[in-house]
Curated annotation (Swiss-Prot):
NCBIfam families: dnaX_nterm (TIGR02397), PRK14961.1 (NF011522). CDD domains: AAA, HLD_clamp_pol_III_gamma_tau. Its EC number is 2.7.7.7. This is DNA polymerase III subunit gamma.
Length: 370
């Protein structure tokens, strides 16, 4: 039985299927429709946002037998071969594994020859920032004035490492992190097609953990399918990722705000006795303080229903009413500092306890919340 991982199985094959990058898709589509096709394109942004996917669709659009179009037919031999990864005129390489100038010379050795089958020869170089200085120099010579039948598509997660001489010769497109709601909608659609049951709260947690990377979210979803035996629940996600429930995070925060020493000791015991990702505790506290700050300044704003339950929303509004903004900001800064120190501390448990103690002892006015 052949199994296809979800990220590959449901990879977008047309521009219309691309999630969360509408302005880039629109710009590329207009370029293709107008026939204003640049010889070098650069896509940059965090992992899992669609750089390579868009590059492959662009390669397909440029070489479709029905003509250059933002809507390739997906039926001709060129389109099919691009999707299968064996199109003879698409040279796709990972620069991380081919950093030497000799590798670049070998790749571009036949650049002067016409395409064997397609309209253009396309060089798709992923993680291009990993190339050596000499490789960049050799690439520059070819990217300055390439033959009419050559197109370069570069992708990177680290724009700062690419020489300005390369950047100045490319059309540059920044792919933004995917919106939480768009990730939830995409995962939900995939799970419906896969006949997998789920809880919407579980998908929200997965989306938050992915930090804007759709591929990370889909990969994490696949892990949760296995953990939950085909049923993705909030409980499974929280247990797997070491995440607290919202009432537990609220309990820790109100203990700090109330300056309740007895409950602080209980918090320490709970953190010690359970298998929790310590960083998640501070991340959740930071997110909660952020929401409280927003409600404090803009009371009319609507909280995210996907992330917070009605009870939690009520608690956030109550804290915002009773608190002082400067105090909340001080708690936020202290928690943020604790998060930065977490990975350099000799013991993360000690680090989280020290951060909570620091927050507990801040010179702030207690807020009594039941």
């Amino acid at each position: 039985m052949n199994y296809h991982i979800l990220a590959k199985k449901w990879r977008p094959q047309t521009f219309n299927d691309v999630i969360g990058q509408q302005y880039i898709v629109s710009a590329i589509s207009n370029s293709l429709l107008l026939g204003r096709i640049h010889h070098a394109w650069l896509f940059f942004g965090i992992r899992g946002t669609g750089k390579t996917t868009i590059a492959r669709i662009l390669a397909k659009s440029l070489n479709c037998k029905l003509g250059i179009s933002p809507n390739p037919c997906r039926k001709c031999s060129n389109c099919v071969e691009v999707e299968q990864g064996n199109f003879i005129d698409l040279y796709e390489v990972d620069a991380a594994s081919r950093t030497k100038v000799e590798d670049m010379k070998e790749l571009l050795d036949n650049i002067r020859y016409l395409p064997s089958k397609g309209r253009f020869k396309i060089y798709l170089i992923d993680e291009v920032h990993m190339l050596s200085r000499y490789s960049f120099n050799f690439l520059l010579k070819n990217i300055e004035e390439p033959p009419q039948h050559i197109k370069f598509i570069l992708a990177t997660t680290n724009l700062e490492k690419i020489p300005d001489t390369i950047l100045s010769r490319c059309l540059q497109f920044q792919l933004k992190p995917i919106n939480l709601n768009e990730i939830v909608a995409c995962i939900s659609n995939i799970l419906h097609k896969e006949n997998i049951t789920y809880e919407i709260k579980a998908l929200s947690l997965i989306s938050q953990k992915s930090e804007g990377s759709l591929r990370d979210a889909i990969t994490l979803t696949e892990q949760m399918i296995s953990m939950g035996k085909g049923n993705i629940t909030e409980k499974i996600v929280r247990k797997t990722l070491g995440m607290l429930y919202e009432d537990q995070i609220l309990y820790i925060l109100t203990t700090l705000l109330n300056k309740d020493l007895k409950n602080l000791v209980l918090c320490f015991k709970y953190i010690s006795d359970t298998h929790i990702n310590f960083e998640n505790i501070l991340v959740e506290i930071l997110q909660l303080l952020h929401q409280i700050s927003i409600i404090k300044i803009i009371p009319s704003i609507k909280l995210n229903d996907t992330k917070y339950s009605k009870n939690m929303q009520h608690a956030i509004q109550k804290i915002a009413e009773l608190s002082n903004y400067n105090d909340i900001y001080l708690y936020y800064q202290t928690a943020l500092l604790g998060k930065k120190e977490l990975h350099i501390a000799p013991d993360q448990k000690i680090s989280i306890e020290m951060t909570l103690l620091r927050m507990f002892n801040l010179n702030t006015k207690p807020i009594y919340i039941k």
